[in-house]
């Protein structure tokens, strides 16, 4: 069974995407699921959280160049530029580059409670003109670079090694994140209940919905080549609130947000009747927003990143319930 691929994203920054990626990954790893987390943010926040917990290196800046996602992207970008063409991509006649990265870029968090189940691919911001945003800009010069992420995952044998692959996406859309959009099976949107999010989240969903068509209509790609490397477009699992503050206007914002998503004619997995008990479902009802939320506690973020200092990647109890519900949805949908 292939690993399920899920990305966490939102156009708005500061809503807890990275914290949520790590926390949900950690809770699932605690339950015995094999998790791979991939850091796509140029700020490398997820990598900083994880970096001190693998042994051998004291901080992210000490990781060698060929132990990062940056190196893998650079490697495949140069391969596509100099050796691969659309014919080889279509037929699958791709050289095995896994030998250059397989033993180098996947790290396991050594915290004993995870029993080797919590893993990550770090990104780094120390390389001049080779941070992830720099690489994404260079990738955009050749549309075939959109196939880099599925190639990396395939040659790392990720489908055989992991149950779930989590992508921590930055608040932007470029060829790198679009590659992740298309390679993913599902996505989750952490957000806060405010006026900006009421329209920002639906805009983000609209962008994701349009990406597949964008590349299918490109004359150098087309639907057949896309289908050879990507499956169907990803499904929205649902939206959940982070940094929740209890006030009278909060439900108003959430109600409008849920209604705006409804108008997109996008059916989230959460909107299925069998998950009605996971949603707001009393006097106030939602279809796409979980009723469980992460309370506004700065300690959640600090305890997640506390690993930078204490060599201890911590789970926070506030994420236990939402993690269990997401896992139940994923397991139910793949039966």
Residue ranges and their predicted role:
Residues 1-335:
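P-loop NTP-binding core
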